[in-house]
From Swiss-Prot:
Result for mutant: residue 121 to A: Loss of activity
The EC number(s) this enzyme carries: 2.7.1.33
Gene Ontology CC terms, in alphabetical order: cytoplasm
Cofactor, how bound (note): Monovalent cations. Strong preference for ammonium over potassium.
Family of this protein: Belongs to the type III pantothenate kinase family.
Identification of the protein by name: Type III pantothenate kinase
Cleavable signal peptide: none
Superkingdom per UniProt: Bacteria
One Pfam family this sequence matches: Pan_kinase
Top EC category: transferase
Residues given in the record as K(+) binding sites: 121
Name of encoding gene: coaX
Organism: Pseudomonas aeruginosa (strain ATCC 15692 / DSM 22644 / CIP 104116 / JCM 14847 / LMG 12228 / 1C / PRS 101 / PAO1)
Length: 248
C-alpha cells in the first residue's frame, strides 16, 4: 500500500491506496499534529511506500517527512518542480515558481485527456491553467477563492460578522441577499462563477471548443453548473503525483 499526501496552504489531504489507485483510507487534516493523529489509527495498514507534494517551505516539508518516516517504515518521495513531465512542458519563465500542486494537476489532466485542456483548481486560492494538445503549458491565472474572499471581507469590514453555518445557508439561493451573510456569500460565488465562465471562453478561443475541462479542489461543486461538460476530479493532484514519483 502507498501513502499519498497533498500538503496545501490550508489543509493536508491524504489517502492510502493499493492496486490500481484504489483508495482504502483517506482524510483531511488542518495541521501536522492532526495528520499524525489520523495516520496513527491507520498504522495497521501495510504501508510500504510514501509520496507527497507540498507547497510549504522546505523546512516545514522536511519536518513533516521526518514525522511520517517515524510512523511508517518508509522513505518518503517528495515531488519537485521540473521543466517537463509526462509530455507536458512547463510554461513559466522560471519553472520553479509554478506551484507544485498546479504543476501536477495540469500534467495529470493532459495525461488523462490526451488533448488540449483547461484545469481549474478551486481551493483557498483559485488557479486556472491552459495546456495545448502538444503538451505546451500556456500559463494561467490565480485569484482568491471563496475562503479568501470571505475572510478578507470579515477582516477588513467591521460590520460583516457571521459564522460558517450562516455562510452555508446563504448559498441555498443566488437571489439578491436580504442579510449580510447572503449578500457576501452570493456575491463571492457570483464572482467565482464569472471567473470560471471567462476561463472557459478563453480556453475555447486559445485551445479550441473541444478542449477538455477539469475541475478540482474543495469548491469545485459550487461552479459545476457553469461548465456542464467538465470532469470533476477531487484527486487530480494525486494522479499527477503518481507520474512525478512512480513507485514499482
Amino acid at each position: 500500500m502507498i501513502l499519498e499526501l497533498d500538503c496545501g496552504n490550508s489543509l493536508i489531504k491524504w489517502r492510502v491506496i493499493e492496486g490500481a489507485a484504489r483508495s482504502v483510507a483517506g482524510g483531511l487534516a488542518e495541521s501536522d499534529d492532526a495528520l499524525v493523529e489520523q495516520l496513527t489509527s491507520q498504522q495497521a495498514l501495510p504501508v510500504r511506500a510514501c509520496r507527497l507534494v507540498s507547497v510549504r517551505s522546505e523546512q516545514e516539508t522536511s519536518q513533516l517527512v521526518a514525522r511520517l518516516e517515524q510512523l511508517f517504515p518508509v522513505s518518503a518521495l517528495v515531488a519537485s518542480s521540473g521543466k517537463q513531465l509526462a509530455g507536458v512542458r512547463n510554461g513559466y519563465l522560471d519553472y520553479q515558481r509554478l506551484g507544485l500542486d498546479r504543476w501536477l494537476a495540469l500534467v495529470a489532466a493532459h495525461h488523462l485527456a490526451k488533448k488540449a485542456c483547461l484545469v481549474i483548481d478551486l481551493g483557498t486560492a483559485v488557479t486556472s491553467d491552459l495546456v495545448a494538445a502538444d503538451g505546451v503549458h500556456l500559463g494561467g491565472y490565480i485569484c482568491p477563492g471563496m475562503t479568501l474572499m470571505r475572510s478578507q471581507l470579515r477582516t477588513h469590514t467591521r460590520r460583516i460578522r457571521y459564522d460558517d453555518a450562516e455562510a452555508r445557508r446563504a448559498l441555498a439561493s443566488l437571489q439578491p441577499g436580504q442579510a449580510t451573510a447572503e449578500a457576501v456569500e452570493r456575491g463571492c460565488l457570483l464572482m467565482l462563477r464569472g471567473f470560471v465562465r471567462e476561463q472557459y471562453a478563453m480556453a475555447c478561443e486559445l485551445l479550441g471548443p473541444d478542449c477538455e475541462i477539469f475541475l478540482t479542489g474543495g469548491d469545485a461543486e459550487l461552479v459545476r453548473d457553469e461548465l456542464a461538460g467538465a470532469r470533476i476530479m477531487p484527486d487530480l493532484v494525486f494522479v499527477g503525483l503518481a507520474l512525478a514519483c512512480p513507485i514499482e
